[in-house]
Amino acid sequence: MEPTYTYRSTEATVGRKSPNGSINIFWRGAQAKDVNKFMSDFLNIYKQGGTSLIYSNPFLASSIIHLLFLRIHPYTDGNGRTARILHNIKFTEMINKVYSTRLKLSPLNISESILVNKITYVKRIDNIYFDIKHDSNEEINAWFNFILDMVKEQLYRAMNKLEKIDSSFIIEDVPTSNMRLSRLKHR
């Protein structure tokens, strides 16, 4: 039995309330009447990918999945969190596929960096148009560059955290019957 999904039935906008009380709309999600169709297409793309270069590259494939989900905006709440989770899952799936690994989850989660850079994140999404009349190559490239910057920033954050952890632990050799093991021991 196929699971059933309940998508929003009202229009969705992403925006911010200004100090004077007016709302600055960044972008609108898909029209409520189109959400089921768009999500059906999205799920097919997610599951099957494609034959283009984008779908042979873990970074590009996961970034596109992230973006498409946000632009459809299928739920009344939690779309950003869900998009970032889908990004991580797709990235892990693609790493496993392309590099024949068996990761359970991506070792790198960019949510923290995205939340710190939320204004730029929203602007990058807002700048991308999905219509035949507009060539969004420049904006799509800006999206990819932004996500790449978030990966770099998150790697930097992770390295700083590891250095702090490393300074409070020492590595100690543990003799065993047939081999030597190393373990972390708190200083």
Q: Could you describe each region identified by the protein language model?
A:
Residues 1-187:
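FIC/Doc superfamily catalytic core
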